Amino acid sequence: MSEAGEATTGGTTLPQAAADAPAAAPPDPAPKSPAASGAPQAPAPAALLAGSPGGDAAPGPAPASSAPAGGEDAEKKVLATKVLGTVKWFNVRNGYGFINRNDTKEDVFVHQTAIKKNNPRKYLRSVGDGETVEFDVVEGEKGAEAANVTGPDGVPVEGSRYAADRRRYRRGYYGRRRGPPRNYAGEEEEEGSGSSEGFEPPAADGQFSGARNQLRRPQYRPPYRQRRFPPYHVGQTFDRRSRVFPHPNRMQAGEIGEMKDGVPEGTQLQAHRNPTYRPRFRRGPARPRPAPAIGEAEDKENQQAANGPNQPSARRGFRRPYNYRRRSRPLNAVSQDGKETKAGEAPTENPAPATEQSSAE
């Protein structure tokens, strides 16, 4: 009985223990080596193998969930490709407009960032009103939008006429050193007329013709130290030839002008090189005063005699107007005659007392 009871109890307890074993297995998983289990196992991700610097393993499902969200934002659903349409209107300042599809007559929103090939001459991306363009239709937040906008067959778009053009850069304008202009009109004539040693201008047959040949600058240029004229002196009205300093090689026979005081005539007219220089006003030589007429000299003597020695004489250098002098000549002549008679009488009266005194003695 005891053996049978033990057998029965053992038989009843074994199935219960076996039933409890699978229930307790999940919460306590034992690590098993790959060699122990015959089933192949998937390789662990690199993030789990490497782990974080703190020793904790990085969570695996987080990157998988974020990747689809970023892909949805980056890529929009394409509804149609290579669709032709006509620009309904486009605002250059705001940077958006609408394109009317030729196939479905539907208005599609277009932004300036969707323009793939812009006009290279335009500064801003834009499409012109009524222009035919080719684009892709994608699904946007508020409806259909245009993407990859180009001209027909992938050519650049024409752009709006209200869009600003790019600045035209002239060749050599910014790279040119600041200094005097290359040549003046007056210098061209002098350089063409004169002859210099060792300078033979190359023949330009067939290279330029007509007006272009006239506008072409000569090959020879004087040294920089002799071309220090600012460029804004080109349009002034004074004679530019007087400011040109002759080249030493040009001072040959036939080119040297008349010598005045050991200096060529052309160098006497040269102005100061400083554009802000203003020469001081120099008073010229005193003009020779004309000799006074006989009548005027007598008139002055009579005036001094009438005024007496105590009265100051008239201010030296005083000149009467020319018209007044001409009008007063006949009057002066009459007065001179009267004064001359008085002057003649005075000396005759003076010697009379002298004779009387001599006789009395």
Swiss-Prot record:
This is Y-box-binding protein 3. The modification N-acetylserine is found at S2. One of its GO terms (biological process) is negative regulation of apoptotic process. Binds to the GM-CSF promoter. Seems to act as a repressor. Also binds to full-length mRNA and to short RNA sequences containing the consensus site 5'-UCCAUCA-3'. May have a role in translation repression. The keyword Repressor applies. It is found in: Cytoplasm; Nucleus. Found in a mRNP complex with YBX2. Interacts with RRP1B. CDD domains: CSP_CDS (cd04458). Keywords: Acetylation, Cytoplasm, DNA-binding, Methylation, Nucleus, Phosphoprotein, Repressor, RNA-binding, Transcription, Transcription regulation. Residues 303-313 have a biased composition (Polar residues). The modification Phosphoserine is found at S2, S33, S52, S126, S193, S195, S196, S313, S335, S358, S359. Residues 1-23, 33-71 have a biased composition (Low complexity). Residues 214-230, 316-329 have a biased composition (Basic residues). The modification Omega-N-methylarginine is found at R243, R315. Residues 1-74, 173-361 are annotated as: Disordered. Expressed in oocytes, spermatocytes and spermatids (at protein level). Expressed in skeletal muscle, kidney, brain, spleen, liver, heart and spermatids. Isoform 2 is preferentially expressed in somatic tissues. Gene3D superfamilies: Nucleic acid-binding proteins. One of its GO terms (molecular function) is ribonucleoprotein complex binding. Its main location: cytoplasm. PROSITE patterns: CSD_1, CSD_2. It comes from the Eukaryota. Residues 82-152 form the CSD domain. Pfam families: CSD. Transgenic mice overexpressing Ybx3 exhibit disruption of the normal completion of spermatogenesis, dominant sterility and abnormal translation activation of repressed mRNA.
